[in-house]
Curated annotation (Swiss-Prot):
The keyword Cytoplasm applies. Belongs to the thioester dehydratase family. FabZ subfamily. It comes from Thermotoga maritima (strain ATCC 43589 / DSM 3109 / JCM 10099 / NBRC 100826 / MSB8). NCBIfam families: fabZ (TIGR01750), PRK00006.1 (NF000582). GO terms for biological process: fatty acid biosynthetic process; lipid A biosynthetic process. This is 3-hydroxyacyl-[acyl-carrier-protein] dehydratase FabZ. SUPFAM superfamilies: Thioesterase/thiol ester dehydrase-isomerase (SSF54637). One of its GO terms (molecular function) is (3R)-hydroxyacyl-[acyl-carrier-protein] dehydratase activity. It is found in: Cytoplasm. Pfam families: FabA. Keywords: Cytoplasm, Lipid A biosynthesis, Lipid biosynthesis, Lipid metabolism, Lyase. HAMAP family: FabZ. GO terms for cellular component: cytoplasm; membrane. The active site is at H46.
């Protein structure tokens, strides 16, 4: 599923829409991707001589992927409420295809906890547990 599908679900837009498409999804799991390009605005400052995609944007991409999963069953605006156990293992560089794998762990009091893993070439580059909610429209 392409960018049009993503834009039909998420409220985010360029330059802060960090998911390019969805590879697969089920009720409690989703796999999405972002193609990292040297033309991404972040590389004007992070770092021009040795561009590295920022870890915080990888985590935001995981959160947006989780938002797609949430908004399939609830209407509203996805809110990123918290992060635990974030780890960054490898650099992500222009030309990489970042794969986001997000799995729902549980729901409690209007919040959803997910586990996210980001990969490049089937190697883990980052992982985190995220807490999300949905603001009703």
């Amino acid at each position: 599923m392409n960018i049009d599908y993503v834009k039909s679900i998420l409220p985010h837009r360029y330059p802060f829409l960090l998911v390019d498409g969805v590879i697969e999804e089920s009720e409690d799991r989703i796999v999405a991707f972002k193609n990292i390009s040297i033309s991404d605005p972040v590389f004007q400052g992070h770092f021009p001589e040795y561009p590295i995609y920022p870890g915080v944007l990888i985590v935001e991409g995981l959160a947006q992927t989780a938002g797609i999963l949430l908004l399939k069953s609830v209407e509203g605006i996805p809110l990123f409420l918290g992060i635990d156990e974030a780890r960054f293992k490898k650099e992500v560089r222009p030309g990489d295809r970042l794969i986001y794998e997000v799995r729902k762990l549980g729901e409690k009091l209007g919040t959803v906890q997910v586990e996210g893993v980001a990969k490049v070439d089937d190697k883990i580059v980052a992982k985190a547990r995220l807490l999300l909610g949905v603001k009703k429209k």
